[in-house]
Amino acid sequence: MAASLPSTLSFSSAPDEIQHPQIKFSEWKFKLFRVRSFEKAPEEAQKEKDSSEGKPYLEQSPVVPEKPGGQNSILTQRALKLHPKFSKKFHADGKSSDKAVHQARLRHFCRICGNRFKSDGHSRRYPVHGPVDAKTQSLFRKKEKRVTSWPDLIARIFRIDVKADVDSIHPTEFCHDCWSIMHRKFSSSHSQVYFPRKVTVEWHPHTPSCDICFTAHRGLKRKRHQPNVQLSKKLKTVLNHARRDRRKRTQARVSSKEVLKKISNCSKIHLSTKLLAVDFPAHFVKSISCQICEHILADPVETSCKHLFCRICILRCLKVMGSYCPSCRYPCFPTDLESPVKSFLNILNSLMVKCPAQDCNEEVSLEKYNHHVSSHKESKETLVHINKGGRPRQHLLSLTRRAQKHRLRELKIQVKEFADKEEGGDVKAVCLTLFLLALRARNEHRQADELEAIMQGRGSGLQPAVCLAIRVNTFLSCSQYHKMYRTVKAITGRQIFQPLHALRNAEKVLLPGYHPFEWQPPLKNVSSRTDVGIIDGLSGLASSVDEYPVDTIAKRFRYDSALVSALMDMEEDILEGMRSQDLDDYLNGPFTVVVKESCDGMGDVSEKHGSGPAVPEKAVRFSFTVMRITIEHGSQNVKVFEEPKPNSELCCKPLCLMLADESDHETLTAILSPLIAEREAMKSSELTLEMGGIPRTFKFIFRGTGYDEKLVREVEGLEASGSVYICTLCDTTRLEASQNLVFHSITRSHAENLQRYEVWRSNPYHESVEELRDRVKGVSAKPFIETVPSIDALHCDIGNAAEFYKIFQLEIGEVYKHPNASKEERKRWQATLDKHLRKRMNLKPIMRMNGNFARKLMTQETVDAVCELIPSEERHEALRELMDLYLKMKPVWRSSCPAKECPESLCQYSFNSQRFAELLSTKFKYRYEGKITNYFHKTLAHVPEIIERDGSIGAWASEGNESGNKLFRRFRKMNARQSKCYEMEDVLKHHWLYTSKYLQKFMNAHNALKSSGFTMNSKETLGDPLGIEDSLESQDSMEF
């Protein structure tokens, strides 16, 4: 058996004794057990070591150099003698032996091109299914791409799928030539990328007439002939013919260059490289010259194969010769042409060239060459056009319009005749095209590109929507924007920004009242019109002479129209959310939209301007936020949108603005009652709205959670916050809450408050005032807005911080020892605390607690600073433990999703709240004996139940609306008008546009570029994003 096998097959090429599916395992096994007869002699090992050291260094990928055929044949025969059981086995199974021999021979061929590997000892191979080598990895790293294995690259370049290869049919390696093709494809070199085969090589399973095995057998049996003299003569003749053909091809190549030069025909408009002022090296000159006309590059463009040409030359050649690169014949189309990198253009424009004009020896940069030559032409023209005996002939541009018409009369007639004959009378198009060609001929391509953009209707300026985003986000009124527009246009001479009328057209699409919609069933007591924009706040209210007079200015959107506009503004986000959940775009719902409602009063919004009725110097704002959108899919609801920043002013959309006092119950009900009526009607109806070209159905869930305690009591008909019924969630009294600090549950609801109001109004049991008050648990007015029994996280922080501020003062005065302190002493404690906090914590004293002060006050550093003013160590420990417990509990009601953001604090909340209550009733008994604050009660008793019901407290807070209050002040100052009525319209419209997600995307794109370092001044920012608890300012907004 050993004699019958060809001796040219090496040990690694699987001879007879290793005709086994696990060939490599056999090799590894022999090395592992170090069979003595297989071990090489020391001389052989040394020779191999020397030869391997002498070989050139290859990449660190699995490159397999081929060894000469006869090197391991003796080794093979020895192995055959040592392992007779292998030979017996393969004698018995001849078919498997043939397949194994076929598989061994396959290893001598390239998988991609099918060529046989060279047997010179230096042939490099690469495993088809192996990792990418280091050189290729570094190349892709420069290209900012990531590739780890060969199959993806082979499929991308050669369109060959090697992932399904079988070792008995396909070769497992490819050659260095194919590797070079892949490397050149992705490198920036100018070398030609050429694959020698047009058809993919097909590999078939082994058959008796197999091409690979058949050619191998024939190759072994071929005899060598004696050299023939006549044959050598024929060979010489063939070589001569080959030389002659080579010379012809060279001549053809030269002649093709001449043809390309004739096609480009640019010798009169492009500069020769001989005009260069410096004698540069030949390679540099070649790099800055066009590869068609061999002139200096004029308006250079780069092809996808990284060759540089003049724009005119390459476009002419592509038109005449076809869509391929003249240098490397790689497919190339006019749309593939791109401008080279700026650094190359800077080098090109800085080259100094000699002026070819006579009597001018100036050397000018290529960038200023056109201007320099045009000065020569102008001076020449002024010398030519002189009337002898008359006054000098003036230049065309210096003439009056009448004189220009007179001089160009004949040309105008000719142009008009041409336009009527060829272009359907479009004189403007003919003149603009002539101007465009003149600019191109003088290499003034920047102006030509701008003109071409204007001719195509694109314009060189910004889109109206981008200009609107800039105006809204930079807080410019219409008049201020118009001044900026005129100034920029006058200075630059170009219309970069769009005029105001274009912005107003863009506004219409984004404001409520633009999109048609329908309700099924129709909304009760609400008009079916859809083109309703800003309306008066009192519209929809049936007024009579005997009613309470309403002295207010109020502007609002209709609630359903505003919701439609908000949904259409989020159209892209909704459709993208459906795609991300693998849902079809054509699904029409029903979608369920969860809306957070917020309302808040503002004090002191007085202005020193404006006419109209005398209205209160306070304001009330009602707004909403789309929190979540789900779609019914099968038996479950799939979430397609969730607001990532539910407490940002960027998503809190204004619905109603009024100049009124929130404590004025009559005015508040008069303005908000129509709005609430629309809301109640929408609860039992479905909206049909066309989105993405398909009518879709929406249902709405309204959750009134963005109210502070004062306003909750106002709209739910409860007594004021000083009442003995201290909680808006349960019926407990202040005394009961102080005795039982933790164990309470939510019992109040809007429906129950309405029933209790009827009992309060009618007194069916004829009880006394005290008995009746105890029966209705503090309900004293008719509830008119449904709110969700919850806690507002922001006001909870502010209320608790105010209480800690009071505790600090009492601890400084040691009230636990001396409870009966005078007012003067208490004021002195407060002054001492304010002075110390200002010195140590840089906290300036304020008249009223706000979110920013509360955040800074509630820290361990503040407690350490306060402890410096308290002599007792025992009180230090009590204060520190109280603050530590509070800081552990705070994240639970502040975070948007406590189960994800702070699961440990959520689990420990009940324990921490009980310990906190224990401290209040023991160490701080002097303050909390028989009483407790409203927010301490809510914090200790109701937080876990609300989290279990809603999943979050912080996400449903009123921070976005509070931040919107600051925006209201800013918009009002910005949109100052003589009429307060129009002023409120401007504020409402501007605030709505400020919350548009469509406009925010333009600003987010700018911010992304800015953070990447593309802007001029990356250090200059408008401020870090601040939450409402930080400063209640609007600086965390879109930035421009």
UniProtKB/Swiss-Prot annotation:
> What organism is the protein native to?
Mus musculus (Mouse)
What PANTHER family does the record tag this protein with? V(D)J RECOMBINATION-ACTIVATING PROTEIN 1, VDJ RECOMBINATION ACTIVATING PROTEIN 1 RAG1
Positions that bind Zn(2+) 1: C266, H270, C293, H295
For the null mutant, the annotation states: Mice display a severe combined immunodeficiency phenotype. The have a small lymphoid organs that do not contain mature B and T-lymphocytes. The arrest of B- and T-cell differentiation occurs at an early stage and correlates with the inability to perform V(D)J recombination. The frequency of homologous immunoglobulin pairing is much lower. No obvious neuroanatomical or behavioral abnormalities have been observed.
* Entry comment, domain topic: The RING-type zinc finger mediates the E3 ubiquitin-protein ligase activity.
Outcome of Y935 to A/L/F?
Answer: Capable of nicking but defective for hairpinning
Q: Where is this region: Disordered?
A: 39-71
Ranges annotated as DNA-binding: 389-456
Gene name in the database record: Rag1
Lipoprotein as a keyword of this entry, yes or no, is no
EC annotation from Swiss-Prot or TrEMBL: 3.1.-.-, 2.3.2.27
The UniProt-reported impact of H307A is: Displays lower E3 ligase activity and affects the joining step of V(D)J recombination
Superkingdom of origin: Eukaryota
Sorted UniProt keywords? Chromatin regulator, DNA recombination, DNA-binding, Endonuclease, Hydrolase, Isopeptide bond, Metal-binding, Multifunctional enzyme, Nuclease, Nucleus, Transferase, Ubl conjugation, Ubl conjugation pathway, Zinc, Zinc-finger
Name of the featured protein: V(D)J recombination-activating protein 1
Its annotated compartments are: Nucleus
Instruction: Give the note describing cofactor binding and stoichiometry.
Output: Binds 1 divalent metal cation per subunit. Mg(2+) or Mn(2+).
Write down the Pfam families for this protein, in alphabetical order.
RAG1 (PF12940), RAG1_imp_bd (PF12560), zf-C3HC4 (PF00097), zf-RAG1 (PF10426)
Q: Which InterPro entries match?
A: RAG1, RAG1_imp-bd, RAG1_Znf, RAG_nonamer-bd_dom, Znf_C2H2_sf, Znf_C3HC4_RING-type, Znf_RING, Znf_RING/FYVE/PHD
